[in-house]
Amino acid sequence: MRRLSAAVMTLVLCLAGATGAGAHAFLERADPRVGSTVHTSPAQVRLWFTEQLEPAFSSVRVVNEGGQQVDKGDAQVDPAAPKQLRISLSPLPPGTYKVIWRVLSVDTHVTEGNFTFRVAL
């Protein structure tokens, strides 16, 4: 019985360690929301992740349907909220926009992705 308890405890500890080591910064939510239609041009895009981000190696950009960048190039991780990445936008005319992000979490794992939102004034 003791051997079984020791084996179970070892397995639990190994699994607990593996979960922490495997943590990545996944996109948790966004504003504007993923796939949404907004009726006013947003002033910025904000992205929330599941892990703290490494500011020097995290980026986001926003492009229009023609692939032209429409953000102000001022992407930054919020110092007061290290899981949030944001970027300012110029006023956007109606259309579909793609948000492209690439982040490095403080646990040194890179994740990247993209999504679209639509402006319909």
Task: Tell me what each language-model feature is.
Residues 40, 44-51, 108-121:
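Extended, polar beta-sheet/loop recognition surfaces of beta-rich domains
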